[in-house]
Amino acid sequence: MTSDKLLQSIGLCAKAGALIVGTPMICEALKASKKRICLILSASDNSDNTAKRLRDRSTHYGVTLHILEVDGVRLGRAIGKSGHVAAVAVTDENLCRLVQKHLAQKQSEQSEDTSQDLLSSSTK
């Protein structure tokens, strides 16, 4: 459920024009500092080279990188694209907070699921 909310909030960023789409465009925007990038979201099925490139650039420019549990096709669909999208970057502070809120909810749900799994396996 939270995954849907997360993808919907990313789609909202796209509709608001507060999203940079694609690894080359993100790297160029970071280098040129044309738009302030708040958060980079990467698909889970990226190649090692793409993942390293995003990780290195986000570290160098001090931008948070989050790897989603969503493949590139699903990420692309969330923003209205028909193909694979490796990464997107959020440029609006308020929308960034919305996306981060949904990321935090998803992580807390996952940690609850993990602790429940541990409890159920220890009682068996």
How would you label these PLM feature ranges?
Residues 1, 5, 49, 70, ...:
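Charged, alpha-helix-enriched surfaces in structured cytosolic catalytic cores
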Residues 5-42:
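N-terminal first-folded block
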Residues 11, 31, 59, 80, ...:
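Signal for well-folded cores of large energy- and translation-related assemblies
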Residues 24, 45, 70-73, 93:
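Short, ordered loop/turn segments at secondary-structure junctions
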Residues 33-55, 63-64:
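N-terminal positively charged helical leader segments and presequences
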Residues 54-85:
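Mid-chain, well-packed structural core segment of small domains
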Residues 76-114:
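C-terminal structural segments of small proteins and small subunits
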Residues 117-124:
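Charge-patterned, long linear interaction tracts outside catalytic cores
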